[in-house]
Amino acid sequence: STCFVKVKLTDAQNYDVMAFKSEKSNLIIHFGLFLKPTKMLHIEEGGVSHVETLSDYWVKRIHSFYRHVNMG
């Protein structure tokens, strides 16, 4: 069985995992945790974790959202 289920963008809740795709393909290259209403927690390569507003840069790259089955 799987520990995560895919959820719709419109059903996203705090701490859902956000998967981001590459600018040039549908390949998932980055992850973050969704924080309502428009923020995420993530770590960029070589950096430290931080909370950031979901700017157009990130919104355009959202691939999918996933929720741990115990958080539903």
Tell me what each language-model feature is.
Residues S1-V48, S55, V69-M71:
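...with weaker cross-activation on analogous glycine-rich loops/strands in unrelated enzymes
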Residues D56-R61:
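Flexible glycine-rich active-site/ligand-binding loops centered on an Asp-His dyad
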